């Protein structure tokens, strides 16, 4: 927990390595995520850096690999393995040169095969079209279409309905066109030829493959009868405009067409054989490439990252050594030293690399070491803001509080089970799903949050049991603490009154109907409340008070955590002027309210009793906490006790009018007055405490500096310098002593404004944030009501109201509808809503009490991370 509760200690280091060993050393460092390099050449353009040529070389190799990958995917060949797994050792230079040559030859071969395949497919397409044209032409002539065309053209010529056509025999053109263009083609041709062309068409049943795009297309064969060369020219231009292909050498006789058809089909068969062999060869080549693709890509990308890191280094004066600066977690410094030594040995360097730890005033990056379980919770915190260096990390507490607050809003046993099963499915199939390398963004979002889904489902089951709620129904495990106090004659009387039109209202008074001897219900909510008319009144009151208690508890816990930050920073002024006043303010008002809620639950029951030494007549005198809180701030006088002094009159107590507004424990007004005064005093302490302390410290340091600077006039300059330097050291010590406060370099005005903002934010935030926690009650109410409405709308009104065989079938149909609506609305939509509200409660209400989040992340150089990012891009 140590590394997660507070970020790791960091060290700023300088790395000096020999030029020839730099590559292997950086490559060895990249095997573990321990080092974040600093760019020592910020003003140098990325295209002018030392290793830009090497990066371009491997960029070209990566481009070739991406081309091969596109061809492999196009042929639906599976690429085994993952890029970011396995060994991260870089191949020797000779093997990398061989790989470069292999990729060049592969790209050349695949492109050559693509060109050859495209040409073969184009020839195959031409032959298939020619075969279809020959078949359809026979069909046209067998149907007597030539005689019909001759007759129609001659009739048009004799009637003079259109301009006269040229003399001569009737000719025809045969062609092929895409089916979707046929209608437009016929209309344009009819108008362009002034109704003097006769056209007929027929669809080709077989789908043809476009050699350019590979898509399946539908085409039609057409035949056009016309007279004269002029009309032929017009037709050819229209065909060209519609990208229709004409076959001008179509045989005139059936015998010639039959001979041509036999020749075409023989050539088609030969081409199919050649295409099959070409595909087999292409498949073998791409399959071999696919088996090695991830390893090749991994090597190329790792080498690129090494050169990118080397571009962050600078040279020494003689150009023999590389100098780099980096951040390293303190506990991994020795691991990095070992990695550097291994890299130097691998390169055969005779000069031992040097790793120096430097002093710096720069704030280190924040590094919280996580695993696959804690990473999602750390991600939730980091989404709001990266923790300031060595600041207390909210993530360990979020692991419990986040799913718990979610379950308060999503508390349903049935819905929790669904969410739990979804989380379990992701967790149990974790390795299998990772190996499939699914790139769908929504899926990866759910998969990344698999552990938080699991916990939210588990906690929702717990909350559902407490609420006694499962798909809007209660379950009776421990029986009910309520009983029927009425006899048969009383029930008969109610039934008779109901039959006479009078409204019957059966009321179970807790004085008589509840089993007081059995104590509170064993666990959760009594199931009888599910059928009660005043169910919402009871549940709303309970959940509202629970929300207030949980909210104030979490905010108080946040304030307590701020104490550990102040202690770690050795800032006593923050403890006395921030933490203590904040705790007193929170305790005097809000923790006091929580105490009142709990005491009211414990002591103010339905029966007459003595509470805190005062006579309590019954539930109608239970104190009103809301009005009591208002009276507390107004310091309004209230009656002491619930009954009038003087005891009983006629055997009964004389109750105070509006007894629920009375003081319910001795000295309540005085105690509450003291609490209000303390809370009010805390505000100016928070507002002026640190600014006043700052002024006092400035005066003290100025006085010390003035005293140290007093030097006798006759002292030699060297001695004077020593005295003055001593004063500077004292000043630096004072600066160091109070440096953790964070305000020593700020002016009084800046600190005053800062404190004013934070004081106002805290005081108003305590009120607004407490109200904000009421969303726990509001969303729980909305979820329960929506679940109940869905149950009644689907089951009661729908399937369960139908009898007979139809009802038997309807139950299955209605259950399917209920299941779909439950998953889509009550689990996904309501779950997302509760998740976002829980996110807000943690980011604002909880973390604002102690978390600054002003840091920047530690981004270590790592082969695994670089490969994962490149794969996701």
From Swiss-Prot:
Places the protein is found: Apical cell membrane; Endosome, Multivesicular body membrane
Superkingdom of the source species: Eukaryota
Tissue distribution: Expressed in the H-shaped excretory cell (at protein level). Expressed in hypodermal cells around the vulva. Expressed in the main epidermal syncytium. Expressed in the sheath cells associated with head and tail sensory organs; specifically, expressed in the apical sheath cells of the amphids and CEP neuron and in the sheath cells of the OLQ sensory organ.
Cytoplasmic side, ranges: 1-407, 467-543, 596-614, 690-785, 829-873
Keyword Transmembrane: yes
Residues spanning the membrane: 408-428, 446-466, 544-564, 575-595, 615-635, 669-689, 786-806, 808-828
MF-aspect GO terms: ATPase binding; proton-transporting ATPase activity, rotational mechanism
Residues with glycosylation annotation: 565, 569
Function: Subunit of the V0 complex of vacuolar(H+)-ATPase (V-ATPase), a multisubunit enzyme composed of a peripheral complex (V1) that hydrolyzes ATP and a membrane integral complex (V0) that translocates protons. V-ATPase is responsible for acidifying and maintaining the pH of intracellular compartments and in some cell types, is targeted to the plasma membrane, where it is responsible for acidifying the extracellular environment. Involved in the assembly of the V-ATPase complex. The V-ATPase is required for the function of the excretory canal.
Family: Belongs to the V-ATPase 116 kDa subunit family.
Listed name of the protein: V-type proton ATPase 116 kDa subunit a 2
Organism lineage: Eukaryota, Metazoa, Ecdysozoa, Nematoda, Chromadorea
Gene name as annotated: vha-5
């Amino acid at each position: 927990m140590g590394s997660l509760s507070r970020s790791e200690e960091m060290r700023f280091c300088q790395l000096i390595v020999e030029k020839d060993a730099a590559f292997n050393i950086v490559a060895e460092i990249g095997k573990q995520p321990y080092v974040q390099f600093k760019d020592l050449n910020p003003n140098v353009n990325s295209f002018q850096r030392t290793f830009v040529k090497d990066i371009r070389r491997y960029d070209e190799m990566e481009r070739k690999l991406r081309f091969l990958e596109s061809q492999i995917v196009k042929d639906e060949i599976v690429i085994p393995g993952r890029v970011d797994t396995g060994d991260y050792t870089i191949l020797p230079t000779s093997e990398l040169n061989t790989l470069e040559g292999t990729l060049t030859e592969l790209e050349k071969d695949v492109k050559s095969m693509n060109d050859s395949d495209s040409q073969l497919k184009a020839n195959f397409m031409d032959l298939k079209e020619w075969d279809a044209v020959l078949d359809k032409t026979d069909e046209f002539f067998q149907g007597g279409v030539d005689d019909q065309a001759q007759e129609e053209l001659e009739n048009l010529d004799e009637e003079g309905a259109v301009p006269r056509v040229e003399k001569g025999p009737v000719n025809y053109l045969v062609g092929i066109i895409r089916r979707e263009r046929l209608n437009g083609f016929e209309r344009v041709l009819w108008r362009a030829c002034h109704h003097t062309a006769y056209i007929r068409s027929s669809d080709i049943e077989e789908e043809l493959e476009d050699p350019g795009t590979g898509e399946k297309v539908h085409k039609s064969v057409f035949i056009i009868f016309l007279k004269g060369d002029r009309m032929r020219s017009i037709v050819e231009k229209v065909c060209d405009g519609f990208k229709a292909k004409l076959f001008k050498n179509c045989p005139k006789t059936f015998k010639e067409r039959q001979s041509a058809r036999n020749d075409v089909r023989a050539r088609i068969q030969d081409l199919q054989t050649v295409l099959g062999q070409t595909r087999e060869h292409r498949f073998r080549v791409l399959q071999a490439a696919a088996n090695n693709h991830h390893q090749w890509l991994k090597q190329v990308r790792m080498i690129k990252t090494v050169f990118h890191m080397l571009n962050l280094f600078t040279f020494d004066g003689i150009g023999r050594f590389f100098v780099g600066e980096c951040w390293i977690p303190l506990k991994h410094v020795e691991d990095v030293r070992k990695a550097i030594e291994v890299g130097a040995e691998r390169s055969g360097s005779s000069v031992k690399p040097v790793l120096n730890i430097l002093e710096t005033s720069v704030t280190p990056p924040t590094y919280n070491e996580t695993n696959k379980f804690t990473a999602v919770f750390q991600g939730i915190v980091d989404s709001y803001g990266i923790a300031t260096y060595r600041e207390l990390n909210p993530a360990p507490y979020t692991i419990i509080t986040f799913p718990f607050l979610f379950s308060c809003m999503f508390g349903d046993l049935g819905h929790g089970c669904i969410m739990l099963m979804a989380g379990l499915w992701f967790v149990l199939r974790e390795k299998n799903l990772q190996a499939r390398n699914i790139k769908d963004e929504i899926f990866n979002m759910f998969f990344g949050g698999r552990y938080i889904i699991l916990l939210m489902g588990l906690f929702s089951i717990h909350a559902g049991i407490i609420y006694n709620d499962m798909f809007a129904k209660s379950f009776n495990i421990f029986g009910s603490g309520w009983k029927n106090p009425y006899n048969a004659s009383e029930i008969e009387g109610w039934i008779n009154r109901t039959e006479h039109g009078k409204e019957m209202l059966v009321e179970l008074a807790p004085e008589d109907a509840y089993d007081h001897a059995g104590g509170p219900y064993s666990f959760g909510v009594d199931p009888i409340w599910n059928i009660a008319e005043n169910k919402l009144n009871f549940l709303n009151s309970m959940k509202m008070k629970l929300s207030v208690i949980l909210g104030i508890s979490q905010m108080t816990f946040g304030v307590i955590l701020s104490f550990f930050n102040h202690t770690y920073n050795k800032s006593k002024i923050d403890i006395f002027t921030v933490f203590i006043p904040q705790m007193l303010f929170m305790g005097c008002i809000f923790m006091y309210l929580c105490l009142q809620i709990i005491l009211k639950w414990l002591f103010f029951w339905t029966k007459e009793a003595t509470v805190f030494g005062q006579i309590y007549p019954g539930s109608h005198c239970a104190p009103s906490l809301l009005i009591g809180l208002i009276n507390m701030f107004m310091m309004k006088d209230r009656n002491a006790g619930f009954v009038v002094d003087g005891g009983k009159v006629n055997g009964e107590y004389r109750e105070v009018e509006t007894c629920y507004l009375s003081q319910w424990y001795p000295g309540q007004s005085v105690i509450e007055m003291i609490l209000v005064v303390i809370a009010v005093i805390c505000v100016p302490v928070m507002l002026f405490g640190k600014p006043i302390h700052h002024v006092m410290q400035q005066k003290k340091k100025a006085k010390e500096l003035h005293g140290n600077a007093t030097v006798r006039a006759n002292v030699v300059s060297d001695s004077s310098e020593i005295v003055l330097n001593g004063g500077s050291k004292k000043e630096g010590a004072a600066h160091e002593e109070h440096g953790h406060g964070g305000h020593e370099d700020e002016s009084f005005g800046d600190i005053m404004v800062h404190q004013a903002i934070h004081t106002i934010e805290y005081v108003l935030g305590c009120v607004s944030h407490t109200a904000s926690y009421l969303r726990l009650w509001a969303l729980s109410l909305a979820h329960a009501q929506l679940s109940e409405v869905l149950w009644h709308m689907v089951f009661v009104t729908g399937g369960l109201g139908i009898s007979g065989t139809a009802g038997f079938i309807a139950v299955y149909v209605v259950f399917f509808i209920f299941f779909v609506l439950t998953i889509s609305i009550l689990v996904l939509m309501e779950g997302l809503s509760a998740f976002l509200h829980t996110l807000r409660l943690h980011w604002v209400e909880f973390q604002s009490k102690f978390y600054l989040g002003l840091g920047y992340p530690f981004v270590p150089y790592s082969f695994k991370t670089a490969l994962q990012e490149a794969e996701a891009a």
